[in-house]
Amino acid sequence: MRLKKLDIQTIKKEKLVQICFYAGILLAFFGSLHPWFLWPLGTLYPLPSGLLIGTAMLISKTTKDNWFTNDHFLAPVMGYVAISTYMLVINETNINGYIVNVFHTAIFYSIFRLKTEKMEAFMTFLCKVMGGLLLVSIPAFFLYLVGFPFVGVDAVYGDDLYSYTNYFLFMIDDRTLWAFFPRFSSVFLEPGHLGTAATLLLSTQFGKWKRWYNIVLLVALLHTFSLAAYVIYVVVIFLKLWVQRKQFIGKLIMMVAFISTIVVGSFFYNNGENLLHDLILIRLEVEDGEMAGNNRVTEDFDTDFEKLCESSAVIFGKKRENPEFGNSGYKVFIYENGIVGTILMLIFYIASLGKIRDRRATASAFILALLGFIVRGYPLWYSNYLTYYDLAHEAPPLPDDAGKKKKEKEK
């Protein structure tokens, strides 16, 4: 009887570890995407997240199946401490920033210590949670488009950088309030943030895209009309085929033909007056040697960036005195953190993603991280980093027979 009682207690402890860790990492993931319901926490979301994860780690030590036994953690933690401390110093952060960074460090430490199979299970859970949220948000958004009277309130975020009408299940950017079809961002700040997050989550679920939560993620991705997310999604498809040692030349030809048909059709359908043409293709037009959709930064910021590159300040970067709306991508990161910060970030990524189980998987994670850095410039956002880390540590693909047996077990 005593043994039976002990087994029950062990099960309860392991379940508590799962609840605390999942809740903590979910909070970190969503906190980095800034949904409206986490705005009150602001940049303090790592505090409750870190406490939950710390609790999970302490309890896990007392169980037979300790979740946090990965021994490749020292170099990644040192790399994170180096880049995060550098960024705090360069951007003249107050003492609160250093306190919050202690909790960020604890969160990253838990990620590096977590067993690979536990991370894979969590990523599937995360996709289900995100899919569940969007499963409610997407229908509500379409009901709004056909005139359903939702109650909305004015919402402002980030010193008036963002202004919305918040309908609670989704938000509408005030700049697109009267648009025929506003881009979908659900409860998050930007369509691009949602699109990129959905794409990266789908990259961890390759071969399982027919499951309900992944279908929902794909539908959400398509309705963000994010050019960057679309491009990354196509790259993900071919990277995953390459990682799994599958022939993709034929698929590449088919996809090019399919995309070409859609593009040509959009120019003729309704004389070019359609969503695909107006929200995506028009941004690919080239004027005066510049692509219309190449608008990651404003002209004023571009001028400031060129001046920075011509001065010695580019070595360490400099703080932006008056951050503007509409600036993102690698230029913003280099402006704020300089060449030294960029090198430290690269070292951190090499240290944390460099434990190779499969060279192709690791290479694909680096390629996606580079694309994300160029487009968004937020390499430490949990919504980005978690997926890169999971992808980099994928095991080599199983032989066909073993792979089929594994799929049958999962079903």
Model-derived regions, located:
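Transmembrane alpha-helical segments and their membrane-water interfaces
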Residues: 56-61, 89-143, 345-351, 355
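Hydrophobic transmembrane alpha-helices and their immediate junctions
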Residues: 234-241, 250-253, 336-374, 393-395
